[in-house]
C-alpha cells in the first residue's frame, strides 16, 4: 500500500469538504445521501468516511469551517460588513444553504444541537469581542448592554441569511444594513 503524505491527505480532505458543501447545498442534509455524496465528491464512501466517521461529522466539519471563516471576517470588519459582502458577492458565500440546514437540524436534533454549540461559540466570541472593543473605543451605543446588541445582530444575521438563501427580494437590504449599523453605533463621534 502506498504511503500518502499529510499534505496529500489534507488535500483529499479539503476536496471532500468542497464536494460535500455542494451536495448539502443542493440536496439539503437529508437529501445528501451517501450515494449523492460519492457522486458529487468524486470519491468512494470508504474514502469519504476515512476522513469523517459519518455524514453528521462531515456536516459538522463544514459548519466548523464556515464558523471559523466567518469569525475571522467578523473580527476584522464586523458582522454588518460580513452581511454587506454576502449581499454584494453571494458567489463567495456558498455556505448560506448549509447555514439553513444547520438551523433546521438545531430544531430537530438535540445531539447535533449540543455539538453545534461548540462550533457556534467561535463566531459568538468573535462578534462579542468586536462589540466590546468598539464599545471601549466609544463607537457603540452605551444605553443597551453588549449582550443585547449581540443577540440583535445575530437575529438580523439569521433573517438576512434566510432571505438570501431562499431567493427572497434583496432590493432594500443595503439600506436595511445601513439602518442596522446606525442602530448599534454611538451617536457621538469617536
From Swiss-Prot:
It comes from the Bacteria. The keyword Zinc does not apply. InterPro entries: Homeodomain-like_sf, HTH-type_TetR-like_transc_reg, HTH_TetR, Tet_transcr_reg_TetR-rel_C_sf. Mg(2+) binds at residue 181. One of its GO terms (molecular function) is DNA binding. Citrate binds at residues 79-80, 130, 134, 185. The keyword Acetylation does not apply. Homodimer. This is HTH-type transcriptional repressor AcnR. It comes from Corynebacterium diphtheriae (strain ATCC 700971 / NCTC 13129 / Biotype gravis).
Amino acid at each position: 500500500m502506498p504511503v500518502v503524505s499529510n499534505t496529500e491527505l489534507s488535500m483529499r480532505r479539503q476536496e471532500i469538504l468542497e464536494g460535500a458543501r455542494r451536495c448539502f447545498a443542493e440536496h439539503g442534509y437529508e437529501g445528501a445521501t451517501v450515494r449523492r455524496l460519492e457522486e458529487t465528491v468524486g470519491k468512494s464512501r470508504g474514502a469519504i468516511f476515512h476522513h469523517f466517521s459519518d455524514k453528521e461529522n462531515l456536516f459538522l466539519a463544514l459548519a466548523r469551517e464556515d464558523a471559523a471563516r466567518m469569525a475571522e471576517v467578523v473580527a476584522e470588519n464586523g458582522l454588518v460588513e460580513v452581511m454587506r459582502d454576502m449581499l454584494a458577492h453571494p458567489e463567495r458565500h456558498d455556505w448560506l444553504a448549509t447555514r439553513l440546514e444547520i438551523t433546521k437540524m438545531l430544531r430537530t436534533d438535540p445531539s447535533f444541537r449540543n455539538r453545534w454549540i461548540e462550533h457556534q461559540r467561535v463566531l459568538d466570541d468573535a462578534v462579542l469581542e468586536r462589540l466590546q472593543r468598539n464599545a471601549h473605543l466609544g463607537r457603540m451605543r452605551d444605553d443597551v448592554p453588549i449582550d443585547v446588541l449581540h443577540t440583535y445582530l445575530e437575529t438580523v444575521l439569521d433573517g438576512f441569511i434566510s432571505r438570501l438563501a431562499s431567493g427572497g427580494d434583496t432590493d432594500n437590504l443595503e439600506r436595511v444594513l445601513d439602518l442596522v449599523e446606525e442602530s448599534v453605533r454611538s451617536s457621538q463621534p469617536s
